[in-house]
Amino acid sequence: MKMLNPQKPRLERRIAGSTNRWRFPRQPFSGDLLGLSQMCKAANIDFDEVLKNPDRLCISQIQKIFPENLKNKTIQSREADVILECLGFKWELHQPQLFQSETLAKLYLMGLARGNANPEKESVKILQAQQPGRSREQRPVKINDPLVTREAFATALKNLYMQEVKICLDDVLGVLAAAHILQFGSLFQRCVTVMMSGLTPSTIKNFYLAGCKYKEEPLTTACEKWMEMNLVPLVGTQIHLRKIPKELLHKVLKSPRLFTFSEFDLLKTLLLWVYLQLNNKTQTFPMYQTVLMFFSSFPKNCAFLDRDVGQNLIPLFLCLRLHSITKGKDLEELRHINFFPESWLVRVTANHYHALENGGDMAHVKDLSTQAVRFGRLFNQEYTTHSKVITLYGFFFEIKGIKHDTTSYSFHMQRIRHTDLECASTVYENTPISLRAERLVTYEIRAQTTVDGKWQEFRTNQITQKFGLAEPSCKSHALKIQTVGIPIYASFSFVFSLS
């Protein structure tokens, strides 16, 4: 930074405190605790804070040192007070705008503080000094962040002079990085807001990593929440799935709020992610059959997760609820690709046999929030009703969403007879049928949507109910909601409790 300075060269040392202890202003903390204490007292700066961060000696009292009429002073001429040199370019800036950026304010104050006992008066002198021939002091600003381009930095500086400059989604990462370097707090938060409202499969990775880099918890939380809802229905259908960081994926898989159409759909999404990690030259989204053929091509003497390449992926697949996959065709497919260790599949099969022998009782499930069977429906604008029939251990249920008016919805589940199904023979072909009149079920219904960029969540309590085959016992409690948000992510989690 080049600052226009009308002063003559002066001695570097100056007196601080009543004991006339000499200090060097370029070194805020030289080890002289007594002198530092006296200087903090004279400047009305917290001593403990300066010990933690000596740079606060330069910028912590900006608002007190400079009167409001200077900070709000309009630009009187085209001549700049400061020339900032960075990124191979010179930027002309004016003093009233500098104090929105802590970095620029710090550099400016360091120049003013050189041998000067009254920075407030000195600031007035510098502002009034418009004559040519002024000496220049150079303080370079080094920017090593590759995200900060000239365009992004120019946008950040433009925000010093103009309110609400439009920030394009394509440029927001660079502007965020520039705002962080400049310590331009209001602009940084504006960028965070733009990013939180602009989450898509193509932006989620970079926005999440930016949140982690700058420790911006609201941004990382927004990314995690968005992924919980969109991993299976949206990201899991696009090539951008490859870019999802493993850490983020693990957090999402562990979340009890994760939305999926079924456990098998979640498994397919995860298999696709692994395939894309191992085939990073693939430019198009693969067919699921291609993924199955790839994993089937490995030697059969060892399951994929037992291989060196699969060992670090085990924590991801431990998050799956494999006991929720009950269709014989799906289980046979998992055996064929030789992906899971044999012990995992044996345990799943044993649990299924035990449940069938005991009328559907799921003795292996202890916690509804982390082990329940889960199904989901994505309720879009065009739907008035949206339902799906599911089968589990010989019992048939319909999960259903109903739109009552433009903002009113309800969601429930209902036990049905297998003979009531349309095309019944195709639905329960090779499927056991239970003749039990009642089935004890513990369940929870949840609906989530966004309104003005903020998530709304509705849910029932955990309810235990005996489901019969006739009304009213065949129907669950209904989750009734009022919202303008679309789409609505409706999740049904349930366990067949011990009878």
Curated annotation (Swiss-Prot):
Disulphide bridges: none
Pfam families in the cross-refs: BTB_BTBDG, BTBD16_C
Domain BTB residue range list: 143-199
Protein name: BTB/POZ domain-containing protein 16
